[in-house]
Amino acid sequence: MLKELSSVQAYLPFIHAMLADPDFRDPMLATPAQLHQHLLDAHEDPAKRLFGTFDGGTLTGLFSVLVLPEEGYLQLLAGLSRQAAAYDALLSHLQAAYPGYQADFVYSPRSRLLHTALADRHAAFDPEQQKMFLRSPPPYVPDSRVQLYTPVFRAQYLALHDDDRYWTGERVLAAQDTFRVLLAIEDDAVAGYLDLTYRNAENEPYDLFVREKSRCRGLGRALLSCAIEKNRPIAMSLRVDSVNLAARRLYASLDFVEKPEENNITAHLKL
């Protein structure tokens, strides 16, 4: 049975037991800040919904979901269960309660139960993402081709931006409290960009892109080096497609180290 919850405080032993299990931990709850934001304090945010699944009086699953009705969008922020029936109950509820919504699910590659439930509903799956953490980067060398975003480059930035994701170029520019944008400029034109989160305990180069004709000129490294410098002294991590060996080598050259236990997969499902 699925129930909507007003809080998860009564279920802390269940939460900590799940997070200690490498086969069932949730990468969206990898840090204390994420644990509070996505689950423990989710009841304080009216855009978040908390659900529990129960077998008799026994808790079998806990879930936190971000719901944005004005955008017809939702995202699973936390999913903790060892039972396939719990994931099926959650997905069935979401399909009934939010028909037509676009839903994203971020989860561990080891979470076969959720993966199977999504595959049964014909979800689309992104490649596995490798988690990497910045350790001790080399000294910063400024590059005159890299600068902070200014509105004069708005049209070029938006034209270049990868919009096959929730954080489109328009949304990034509108979220000035979440992102800062770095641009790589060649011949007065935008040749690349990096969307960098900030104001967090740990920030992330969320999207790094260099146009094809400008590649192999050090622009990706220059953008990332500038992002690291502007982020100091805050911690930094990122995710990259596991199959993208060139990008992983670039990040490793700046002393990002891999942490495979925090890898994830994103699935997309039209409810």
Segments and roles (model prediction):
Residues Q83-A96, V210, C216-E229, R248-S253:
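Conserved acetyl-CoA-binding loop-helix of GNAT-fold acetyltransferases
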Residues M1-Q34, Q129, P138-W167:
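Short amphipathic alpha-helix that is part of the acyltransferase structural core
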Residues A103-Y107, P205, M236-V240:
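Conserved hydrophobic beta-strand within the GNAT/NAT acetyltransferase core sheet
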Residues A30-A89, L194-Y206, E212:
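Conserved donor-binding loop and adjoining core beta-sheet/short helix segment
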Residues P109-P127, R221, V243-P260:
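Conserved active-site alpha-helix within GNAT-family acetyltransferase domains
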Residues P127-L148, R239-L245, E258-L271:
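C-terminal "cap" of GNAT-fold acetyltransferases
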Residues P27-L50, H161-Y193:
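Active-site rim helix/loop that mediates acceptor-substrate recognition in acyltransferases
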Residues E70, A78-P142, I265-A267:
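Acyl-donor-binding surface of acyltransferase catalytic domains
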